[in-house]
Amino acid sequence: MTNNSTCIQPSVISTTALPVTYIFLFIIGLFGNSLAQWVFLTKIGKKTSTHIYLANLVTANLLVCTAMPFMGIYFLRGFYWKYQSVQCRLVNFLGTLSMHVSMFVSLLILSWIAISRYATLMKKESKQEATSCYERMFYGHVLKRFRQPNFARTMCIYIWGVVLVIIIPVTLYYSVVEATEEGQSQCYNRQMELGARPSQIAGLIGTTFIGFSFLVVVTSYYSLVSHLRRVRTCTSITEKDLTYRSVKRHLLIIQVLLVVCFLPYSIFKPIFYVLHQREGDCQQLNYLIEAKNILTCLASARSSTDPIIFLLLDKTFKKTLYGLLTKS
């Protein structure tokens, strides 16, 4: 096997561009998400299910923002650190844990928001257009729950609990066992970047989960468009069309987020696991590792840009924030 010190050689992209990007994302993400959380918790009186989902999404964003300085320092100095050093262990564990917990919590909440927005559309239609017993039960009881604040709070608690129970053991195993199996000396090493088979299997399961979340959003969006076309063929434009357009815009925003930020990462992950197994091709290995790290950074960038998305997703948040800015 090619020696780690000669095979794994980070380029200027890893040692300069990624640290600068992570620090920049940390600054704007911390400010924007802190402001958003302050608005959600203190300035919005009657909270809807959407507000609860978004507040938990902000919490996940703040979690990944706290990991960004660790990730930036890792790429800047990791090649020079000894693996057994305190800073290496700390950066590795906290960075990996925060990044993955935030990613999966965000995906689940985005999926729940998509279902909640679709439930908003079907609220009035369930009584007017549902004819079968199945339709009345599904639209009147199942989807209705996604719009209830208490249900939203309960689901968010379950989301955080399940994700933490799954991610923490995997991260501990990766940080304590896998990254030291081959006796690497540097913190930035082959085993740290690739992981052993258990971590790769967990990564593939996570990729499948990302695909499922994307499928939920796409299905909600497709159902909305189909319903809107059916309504417009038999009715004139009414006030409800404004609701349709609003929900359609919300689902489209979530869909674009998943496509731009998460889909490249999830598509590349299986390819990465297959191609890196070729022994001796150090140049290709370095390219693969840097591509993986760039796409991971892209996935985490969503957390820093979410406050802008909130302005598009929630009118109450937009009015409250504009009111605060006007007063100041």
Curated annotation (Swiss-Prot):
Signal sequence interval, chain numbering: none
Compartment(s) of residence: Cell membrane
Cysteine disulfide links: none
Any one GO biological process: triglyceride metabolic process
Keyword Glycoprotein belongs to the record: yes
Topological domains annotated Cytoplasmic: 33-55, 116-156, 219-251
Its membrane topology: Multi-pass membrane protein
CDD domains attached to this UniProt entry: 7tmA_GPR82
Function comment: Orphan receptor.
PANTHER family (alphabetical): G-PROTEIN COUPLED RECEPTOR 82-RELATED
Family designation: Belongs to the G-protein coupled receptor 1 family.
Name of this protein: Probable G-protein coupled receptor 82
